[in-house]
Amino acid sequence: IPRNGKFLYSAFSRFNAQDTMAFFEELGVPLKTERGNRVFPVSDRAFDISAALERRLRKQKVSILKDRAVSLEIENGGVSGVRGERGRYPASAVILDTGGVSYPATGSTGEGHRMAAEAGHTVTPLRGSLVPLRDFGVGKTLQGLSLRNVGLTVLEDSRKIYTDFGELVFTHFGLSGPLILSASAHMRRFGERAYHLEIDLKPALDEQTLDRRLLGDFEKYSNHDFCNALNDLLPQKLIPEIVRASGIDPRQKVHDITREQRRGLLRVLKCFPVVIAGPCPVTDAIVTSGGVKVGEVHPASMESKLVRGLYFAGEILDVDAYTGGFNLQIAWSTGRAAGIAAANED
């Protein structure tokens, strides 16, 4: 969790990932754990999760009122109700868990942030996080190419701000995949800073070992053109881009390649450069970065420090995490904390 992780310590300590799994299995949703400790319903259907929650609501005789909340009603420093399009709903406790501004087709359009701001809360700038990245053309050239087990370094101007290992994919607009989505969470200053990526295509090999590998391939293909000498080392689709980046004439015979040229190729293989134009729109982001300032919320109960009886949960808060189910766990843990505290309101 790259931002405001400490705020979540209390909520996570009382309801963690194991508690979440036990909860849903108790609701009749069998789960499975896949690569990377990612947990899914055995059915692979997200619908089974929402259906199980709805069954629990009905069992607990919870009333579901389908209306669009317009504003909070606040009296004497505390919540007194919610005003909707169809009328007023009196309440001594209200939980705002309206999500972020990603995926607006789901109804998550940022109205909760507006209501929080009207109640006096600070809402930090809203941006897309876990979002694909646009580049200046390499992605379109390599569209459809997926690279597994590569290293990634993100540079903000010339300063290294993030490094990781995993899988990425080139698309018609740029880059995506788990590695790129997590990296995007650290790229928050587009317009103020320049970002570029360095992809280590052979992270399992240090430069000396990779150089020996190149020498072996060059000996094998010594009479070939350079552009035809990398087939054992790289995916076919990637080779023209590597040749271009190396600066070596694609028709140069391998036996004529100098030691200095080979060292340049080695640098490209360990630091293949991609200049980033910017993120894709926030509507394409998996989660929203930014939200209600956590310093204005009690971390144990999720209650507002400014308005009595007002609670927050999930993506409306200024907390977001990497891909891998962490953002869902934030929703479960903060939702439970807010729900228990709100239920105890007089």
At which residue positions do the language-model features occur?
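Catalytic, metal-anchored helix/loop core of enzyme active sites in primary metabolism
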Residues: 1-15, 177-178, 206, 210, ...
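Conserved N-terminal/central alpha/beta ligand/cofactor-binding core
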Residues: 1-63, 68, 170
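An anion/pyrophosphate-binding glycine-rich loop and adjacent beta-alpha core
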Residues: 29-30, 122-127, 132-256
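Flavin (FAD/FMN) cofactor-binding core of flavoprotein oxidoreductases
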Residues: 39-46, 129-138, 279-296
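Short hydrophobic core segments
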Residues: 65, 69, 82, 88-108, ...
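A glycine-rich dinucleotide-binding beta-alpha-beta segment and adjacent secondary-structure elements
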Residues: 65-71, 240-320
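Conserved beta-strand-loop-beta-strand element in the redox core of flavoprotein oxidoreductases
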Residues: 71-94, 148-158
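A conserved FAD-binding loop/helix module that cradles the flavin
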Residues: 93, 100-119, 318-346
